[in-house]
Amino acid sequence: FLPLFASLIGKLL
């Protein structure tokens, strides 16, 4: 799991 991907999910949430 990439941290950048997690950042995108955080913005969606």
Swiss-Prot record:
Its main location: secreted. Expressed by the skin glands. GO terms for biological process: defense response to bacterium. Coiled coil: none annotated. Disulfide bonds: none annotated. Antibacterial activity against Gram-positive bacterium S.aureus (MIC=140 uM). The modification Leucine amide is found at residue 13. GO terms for cellular component: extracellular region. Belongs to the frog skin active peptide (FSAP) family. Temporin subfamily. It is found in: Secreted. Keywords: Amidation, Amphibian defense peptide, Antibiotic, Antimicrobial, Secreted. This is Temporin-1Cb.
